[in-house]
């Protein structure tokens, strides 16, 4: 396994936050509705991990270090783990496992439908994020995994619908997402290695 320390570091960093939040909830420091806080934090954690995952390829192009790509799939699977925890926390703390309330929630809060669509797409991507699926799907695998940008759009819409009034934090994540999308445009992507390659030449001339 390449970059084992890097991979272990990513594992610890991703695993520690849900455990820390659970500890905070158990310690009664999350306010009067700790369950709702957990749901929100896990949802935001999912979005942040998705953005970090999408940043791995541009970072590899910019730096030339293969370690970014080495943890990309790991980060993607952690993103899926977070969204599963987000959904589980919603079912336990918001619905109270009362499935009869789900229809009421869907009518009152249609952003839940948007979130559910994002979850289903992430499920497909997680299930096919292995070498067997890559071999079976061939060139279609890359096309399928471009759905991650649809997931990003759904995640941002889901968050926008929830926050509504205070858009400052949402605007930060949306801007990062937009930048990552621009960096994946083929002409822009092709220019990144050239920009890096020009740096030593410029330094030599100076």
Swiss-Prot record:
The keyword Transmembrane helix applies. Binds 1 FMN per subunit. Pfam families: Ferric_reduct (PF01794). Disulfide bonds: none annotated. One of its GO terms (cellular component) is plasma membrane. One of its GO terms (molecular function) is metal ion binding. Its cofactor is FMN; heme b. Heterodimer of a catalytic subunit (MsrP) and a heme-binding subunit (MsrQ). PANTHER family: PROTEIN-METHIONINE-SULFOXIDE REDUCTASE HEME-BINDING SUBUNIT MSRQ. This is Protein-methionine-sulfoxide reductase heme-binding subunit MsrQ. It comes from Pseudomonas fluorescens (strain SBW25). The gene is msrQ.
